[in-house]
Amino acid sequence: LYMLGAAMAALAVDPVMFVSSRLLQGVSVCCTAVVAFSGVRDRLSGNEAARAFGFLNGTLNIVPALAPLLGGLLAEAFGWRAPFWFLALYGLLVLVLIIMFLPETRPANTQPINGLPIKNYLRILRDSRFLVFALVNAGAMGMALTYVSLAPNVLMVDAGLSPLQFSLAFGANGFWIMAVSFFANRIIQKVGRPTCLMIGSLLMALGCFGLLFGLTQLSVDVQHHWLVYMLPVASACAGLAFMMGPATSYALEPYANEAGVASALVGFVQMAGGAALGLLAMALPIEPKLSLAIVMLAVYWRGKRAEPVNMSAASWKKYTNNGK
């Protein structure tokens, strides 16, 4: 489906065909995300699952940062259709790798599902623990989407960066997210998932403080410098890298026998909730940086609410595999 959608986009002759092709690509990406996340849940648990989810989320979050840079270079060199032909070839490569190396991960006792699992979705959504951690992911994604949406105006209009400089700053932050994700994955075995959630929450708060400090304590000219925006964003993105792996593993942990359904629901809450939070922030009639600071503060609050100090000892021990 992804290759078909990419080829349709490359061959599009009108807006309807182009938008339809992008929708087809979106559906196929959702399917692959569910497979990846449910496969991790099938094979791993505890800190190992958190490390794998952290890597997956780090990879997912680097794409919005690097895609404009790579796509822009391809489009400038070969025309606007070139990025979509590249995606079609990339999809073919991934298909070959799946056929060669991806085994079946589903446990033998997986619950069979016929049709749309609406009842399963509703039952999982009623689990307050699931919602706590799924909403942590939604908040982190909302922060990322808000940052991405506001960046062109803040960096190019206010800070005066050229398109190339903007792409480099964007790409550098993408590599930063991946680097912090790798670091978080390395230390999670030593400090545990609750500590990583706490670190992520504090980094979100630091990003919020940085934006507010720039808005209230610096002169207007200095406020528009690109680093005044990107340094707090870098802190918040580091917080995202620390939070999303543990939060995803906690959300999926009780659903070993229906990992696919739970993974799909985590993805839906993450993307839909993140998009709603981002749209709400951008709709506020205030300074864009202040909108982003509010989102960071909301993610900090959500992360703090998910920490074990706010749960009973018995429920936390049961839910987090003996606190690890």
Put a short name on every predicted segment.
Residues 4-8, 16-24, 227-232:
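Paired small-residue
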Residues 15, 21-62:
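Cytoplasmic helix-loop-helix junction between adjacent transmembrane helices
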Residues 46-47, 54-102:
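Helix-loop-helix hairpin linking two adjacent transmembrane segments in secondary transporters
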Residues 103-134:
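Juxtamembrane intracellular "pre-TM" segments in multi-pass secondary transporters
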Residues 127-144, 234:
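Pair of pore-lining "gating" transmembrane helices in MFS-fold secondary transporters
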Residues 180-194:
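Helix-to-loop junctions at the C-terminal end of transmembrane segments
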Residues 249-285:
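A late C-terminal transmembrane helix in Major Facilitator Superfamily
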